[in-house]
Amino acid sequence: MASTFSKLLTGRNASLLFATLGTGALTTGYLLNKQNVCAAAREQHKLFPPSADYPDLRKHNNCMAECLTPAIYAKLRNKVTPSGYTLDQCIQTGVDNPGHPFIKTVGMVAGDEESYEVFADLFDPVIKLRHNGYDPRVMKHPTDLDASKITQGQFDERYVLSSRVRTGRSIRGLSLPPACSRAELREVENVAITALEGLKGDLAGRYYKLSEMTEQDQQRLIDDHFLFDKPVSPLLTCAGMARDWPDARGIWHNYDKTFLIWINEEDHTRVISMEKGGNMKRVFERFCRGLKEVERLIQERGWEFMWNERLGYILTCPSNLGTGLRAGVHVRIPKLSKDPRFSKILENLRLQKRGTGGVDTAAVADVYDISNIDRIGRSEVELVQIVIDGVNYLVDCEKKLERGQDIKVPPPLPQFGKK
């Protein structure tokens, strides 16, 4: 159980706490010296004008590169969050990775909850660009985890092979993974697994530390889509999220392997409900029930998730703000996937396609991973219903093409639930 002292120790005022409690000049001196070194580095940084430090983004194709201007950079360059995170650290992954051939990446991350406020002049336009016009300066994000509102949640299993819903949650008071110290990573792991031990019934399970798994066990879990990949993605490595791997990383799952929690990958936690077949309503019901129970258990231990009414749940990448939810299916659509209207149909249904194994993978045997594009501005119930209605439309199109009938491109969905 995390004590108040433990939370303060990993918070923003550790050096002041040590000095006040008199726990020793050595510890206090180390922390203060670290702060002094960082402050000295920032002062050295200021010797150069912002124009001399501005990144070359002329060949970049990501949201950060599109929104960052010399004026915004000059305004934000020397600002730091309470944990010492800077604008240059936020954007480095987008500077190092110009873009993606199929998916427009965000190009920046947050190092802590405060990053979204301190660097709002850049984060806000990036969020608006990435999230279909959602403006965090004037809009509020809705939350709804009432799975009973879902309709027509059973897919035709001749086409839909598996169903999955995931989200992320961050623990308030600790840095996000790009800025996490080893101590903070271990505290995240401790907070999470201590809470998860309280899950009962069909949610009960156990935790597996990555550092204690064999290579064969890890790869088997990855191949079965239970475990996150090894941190080889440049988007993760350039953001600093692969540091100290596999320290304090792991996976918790129930005994049926239908409810899983990843620890300390891109986010503090990723909560996942999944199963074979096409019963998305059941998957979402378990997701909502499990997520509510995890939050209750964490709150019982004196912690809470990062959340505010503008951005919803706070996560590392701006692409996952709001619900953090991705509801997806593996669906076999050999005829529709070859139709020239396929991409437009997906766009109008607010869906996206990935290969069978996710981003940057091919579709094996005409099986695609289809999921919602949006994360913020719509509730969890709305997003899952969009996926259900959209996938049913795709399956209906596939059946028509099998019969030699024509299909239509549906009208675009209204923005943010507008009628």
From Swiss-Prot:
| Boundaries of every Phosphagen kinase N-terminal domain copy | 46-132
- Cellular compartment(s): Mitochondrion inner membrane
Taxonomy-wise, where does this protein's organism fall, top ranks first?
A: Eukaryota, Metazoa, Chordata, Craniata, Vertebrata
Which CDD domains does its entry note? creatine_kinase_like
Q: What is the name of this protein?
A: Creatine kinase S-type, mitochondrial
- Relay the record's extra comment: Mitochondrial creatine kinase binds cardiolipin.
What's this chain's function? Reversibly catalyzes the transfer of phosphate between ATP and various phosphogens (e.g. creatine phosphate). Creatine kinase isoenzymes play a central role in energy transduction in tissues with large, fluctuating energy demands, such as skeletal muscle, heart, brain and spermatozoa.
- Where Phosphotyrosine occurs along the chain? Y255
One GO term under biological process is:
phosphocreatine biosynthetic process
The record's principal subcellular location, in a coarse class, is mitochondrion
Reading the lineage from the top rank, the first entry is Eukaryota
